[in-house]
Amino acid sequence: MKKLTSTEIRQKWLDFFESKNHLVIESKSLIPVNDSSLLWINSGVATLKNYFSGKKVPPAFRLTNSQKAIRTNDIENVGVTSRHHTFFEMLGNFSIGNYFKKEAIAYAKEFLVNVLEMDFEKLYFTYYEEDLEAKNYWLENGVDESHLISGTRDTNFWDLGSGPCGPCTEIFYDRGEKYDRRGLDLLKNDIENDRYIEIWNIVFSQFNNDGEGNYTELKQKNIDTGAGLERLASIMQDVPTNYDSDLFINIIREIEKYSPYKYVIENYFAKDEHQGEINTNFKIIADHIRTVVNAIADGAKVSNVGRGYIIRRLLRRSYYKGMQLGIKDLFLHKLVKVVKDSLPYEYNEKDVIDAIKEEELLFSKTIEKGKILLESFLDNENKVFDGAVAFNLLETYGFPIELTAEILHQKGISVDMDAFELAKEKHALASKGGKATGMDKVINSLALIDKKMDNFVGYSELSANSKVLKLFDEENEVEGFETGGYVLLETTPFYATSGGQRHDKGFIIQGENKIKIIDVFKDKFGNHIHFVEGKMNNHEPVSSFVDPNIRIGLERNHSGTHLLFCALRNVLGSHIEQLGSDNNEERLTFDFPADEKPSDEQIKAVEDLVRSYITKSIDREYITTTVDKAREMGAIMTLEEGEYMDPRAIRVVRFGDITSDLCGGTHLSNTSKLESFKITNVEKKQAGVFRIRAISSSKLVNEYLSKVNKKLNEELATIIKKIKELKSDYVAPAINENEPDIETLNASINKRIDELREVYKQLLKESSNLEFDYETVKFDKIKDYDVYINLDVDASAVKLIAASIRDKFQLGKTVAIIGSKNENELLLAIATRAIDANKMFKKLASELNGRGGGAPILAMGKMNYSEDIESLIKDYLPDA
């Protein structure tokens, strides 16, 4: 069995099933689209449910994917067992009414034995005891009966109580006695172990359960499979646990740079208890940071609500585990690059780093605050600390129970862990009834509110007088608080985060106290819950004041989002949908589906169209109507109708005959108040989804254009300087400084820079050809190829020299490999007409964590430098 990287395993899976006429589906976002039943995409089939249910026509009836997924229901086992993860990749092959058991079983055997070259004798197979058809197909594929284990309904039958269901067959790999001396009893009795690793599960969707336990055969039978990439990687790389595979180990080695401790792979067998605890902490951080990075990259935001609450919990748990590893500084945000390098997904690295760093800073302050709170609860006469209070510190303030126990231990005080676990169980039971969101958790756990109680006046007013209906923390209703908590007002002008618009900011006045608004969100009844900072009581009236500057910024960018959406549909086509948006007072983002990035010309057309709407000074209307009438008037249903409490009275925002949208947000009264509009970036968010970033208002747009102008002028000066270094008498053409506006001037400078880059490239080519002595080129005969390797070339000339050698020396089998070393990084170009340069480069890049590629005659990119690079190059040359 050949050692394979995770990248190679993933690609082999997709290539194999593509060769079996499966359509390759790219991994979708971790955040479900139009599926309120899921908090996260949690399996390979989760994004394909509508194809199996018949709600949508599939693009093909044979599909395959490698889908990223998140599950956090078993978090306590992460890092403790060899294979539990919160983030993982599920390899899948699916048949929608096409092939069934015979083909699915044959494909599985062929892939594992012929493609991955696994030892057939080390594979074991379970099947449902009544499914003799599946058993016989395994026998037909050469499986010895001693390697077939029958299972019960509990182990080998998928049934959710009603709907499609059926038996399944599982494939296990035997890693040998060194992992567990017990034999097949482990499989037969379904005992958790590290010897027999489940690597593949094939579900035969064969029956329909009517909910009463009556089963009928489905006319359309389906195949749903899942194979864990992490498990396959650990087997193919012959390492003790998933965490020792290439998907995790580089992350762990990066964490080691900030810790005085080391992760020891060999401890799996050595069983040193202290080292085991150290290893577990490394594993937990490596697992959690993968989840956090990919979730944020897909658009999740750290918060106390829903997905954001889970991200916050994982980040804080990781931060504390870092403390246990002796890490004193902020370090989690420094792991983003190594996580990104280990996986094939593209996203804006800086956004993820910024989000994680902000949460790290916040939690570091929380820990200091938690220590003070802990001291305030102490009773030095009592040597046992109330576990319920310890749980409250964890849930309300995010203060880890381990840290509470550690601080108290130093004072000779223990924590009543029975009381802690009881409080935890009560909290879990109270939270199960509602949606998995932070706000529901708060409301459900207290049972404070059972109906709509407040009145929102923020559409027309920026201030309001009100009485306080309720004050509470996350556990109890309170009569008052000293530093902050949650507030329900009878009347509020503060808009709650929803529909892509961020919440208002401002303050509440109560007597002599000024209370700061930190967050505003809605509970399930539509009440506005205010999270505030300051001193407050529940018996004095209050006055609330929205910050008008923040509100106008929010309204600009929310109205700008509507106008942008309209312009996109006009320029790119009416098929464009709004997949997500986020508007704050400074900028807006808009996510939309597209097979490829819009061209610069298309983006300019969109921008110009939005500006034309501004110039037209169109009044805004708020219209309350029914869903049916909203559709008749052409309103775009960008929000789920379920957000509106009464479908007979929904709200439409209309700007003349330009755009009508279902929307609950606040907006400008006229398009002219947007003042200006500028798209600052268009980036690929994930497969098939792009994100536009934009700003509005004359002030912000002018500030942005001025910064761009400064940067362009610096770039212009740099390129002119570089050209003069190559040709001292060069005179750059002048730029017209009398352009009508700064944006036109910037476009002029940008165009001139592009022209000068071409001049520089040509001069550099001439210079490189003069400076490089081609007479010194000597070829080595390797596998019947004429190979020239030189890794000491100036970085600016690597590509040119590689291509020149390829073209100058027409020896039939010339392969030029030119590189430039920079500390531990290597810039490498492969130029040849004898082999596929791109394929060879990809193999090297996979081995050395590289990126790049190109065409069959020239491929180029960066990778880690290795002393063995030349021998690797020789190994990866195909046989002539």
Curated annotation (Swiss-Prot):
Subcellular location: Cytoplasm
Single Gene Ontology MF annotation: alanine-tRNA ligase activity
Catalytic activity, reaction form: tRNA(Ala) + L-alanine + ATP = L-alanyl-tRNA(Ala) + AMP + diphosphate
Pfam families: DHHA1, tRNA-synt_2c, tRNA_SAD
InterPro entries: aa-tRNA-synth_II/BPL/LPL, Ala-tRNA-lgiase_IIc, Ala-tRNA-ligase_IIc_anticod-bd, Ala-tRNA-synth_IIc_core, Ala-tRNA-synth_IIc_N, Ala-tRNA_ligase, Ala_tRNA_ligase_euk/bac, DHHA1_dom
Main location group: cytoplasm
UniProt-annotated binding residues for Zn(2+): H558, H562, C663, H667
Superkingdom of this protein's organism: Bacteria
Gene Ontology cellular component annotations, sorted alphabetically: cytosol
SMART domains membership: tRNA_SAD
Class of enzymatic activity (EC top level): ligase
Cofactor(s) it depends on: Zn(2+)
NCBIfam families the record matches: alaS
Protein family per UniProt: Belongs to the class-II aminoacyl-tRNA synthetase family.
Notes concerning its domains: Consists of three domains; the N-terminal catalytic domain, the editing domain and the C-terminal C-Ala domain. The editing domain removes incorrectly charged amino acids, while the C-Ala domain, along with tRNA(Ala), serves as a bridge to cooperatively bring together the editing and aminoacylation centers thus stimulating deacylation of misacylated tRNAs.
Protein name in UniProt: Alanine--tRNA ligase
